[in-house]
From Swiss-Prot:
Name of the protein in question: NADH-quinone oxidoreductase subunit H
Gene Ontology biological process: aerobic respiration
Quaternary assembly: NDH-1 is composed of 14 different subunits. Subunits NuoA, H, J, K, L, M, N constitute the membrane sector of the complex.
Example of a GO cellular component annotation carried by this entry: plasma membrane
UniProt lineage: Bacteria, Pseudomonadati, Spirochaetota, Spirochaetia, Leptospirales
InterPro entries: NADH_UbQ_OxRdtase_su1/FPO, NADH_UbQ_OxRdtase_su1_CS
Membrane-crossing segments per the record: 6-26, 76-96, 128-148, 166-186, 198-218, 260-280, 289-309, 324-344
Catalytic activity: a quinone + NADH + 5 H(+)(in) = a quinol + NAD(+) + 4 H(+)(out)
Keywords associated with the record: Cell inner membrane, Cell membrane, Membrane, NAD, Quinone, Translocase, Transmembrane, Transmembrane helix, Ubiquinone
Family per similarity comment: Belongs to the complex I subunit 1 family.
EC number: 7.1.1.-
Amino acid sequence: MNWNEILFWLLKSGLFFFILITACAYYTLAERKVAGFIQDRKGPNRAGIWGLLQPLADGIKFLTKEEVFPTQVNKIMYLIAPAISMTCAIMAWSVVPLGGRIPLPQWLQDRTGLVFLDLQIANPDTGILFLFAISSLAVYGIIIAGWASNNKYSLLGAIRSTAQMISYELPLSMSVVSIVILTGSLKLTDISASQAGLWNIFKLPGFIAFCLFVVAMFAETNRLPFDLAEAESELVVGFHTEYGAFKFALFFIAEYMNMITMSCVVTLLFFGGYQVPFGILEGHVLQSLFGLFFFLGKVLFFTFLFVWVRWTLPRFRYDQLMSLGWKKLIPWAVLNILIASLYIQF
């Protein structure tokens, strides 16, 4: 790998990070706008035209707030916790493909040695396995935040969140196993390409896996109706209680990054990813560009679904949450692996 290739890769990584941060910023605005619509009010509309500068105002607010350290906290672990959550969210995003390969112009091929531009930072053979392995590490940031805060509300929220994430990682992962059985690959690009003729959602094992995945997805991202870790009426804001300013912003952004990543993953696993429907533009240079637009349209729907569910459904009780995961989702996930195995045989 020469210096031109390294520089090109660094620029692409920086661009993808900028896209993710910008998407998170405007996702917060979109959520507040949708919440306002559902509650029959306008939402943010003071910063810029239609409130479009509200994310910038919020970012400046978080960056300029005074950094306060409560006297009882373990400072080193207290600072490490939000960094772990943010790092895991960024690393999980790095293997998500946004589209197919785009051929580069000749002058750029000569300078970089690359023929195609992959619309993802990395494409390892263990793509989906890497994504869930990194996502599962985020639980360390949460439990460290609760423990280092030396606050009973923070600790209770962290314990709840840890138990919830570990419990729902099982059905989430097992639902993906059935898709891996159907497609025969762990690479997200291969899983998307295998759905060129028929989306996985229209196959029996794929439909069951989709239902399991969506429920577990809400629990994994700590969103309503599974936000037991941040139950305001019981735990103030859970493991966030002692965090403010930029440290809280890292947790906040990581949560929205995870929601966007999960929306991308559910699109890639069940809804054809970036495949252009009906074979339109097959082999054409614009196929990748149109594939990107179709992919983003599906992702926008699932990001909207997160918001819609948040402002529609009430919170589960903790015992209901655990019962649903261990008594309902996990048995169905195990059964679906068997169904997927039989499906490819017959």
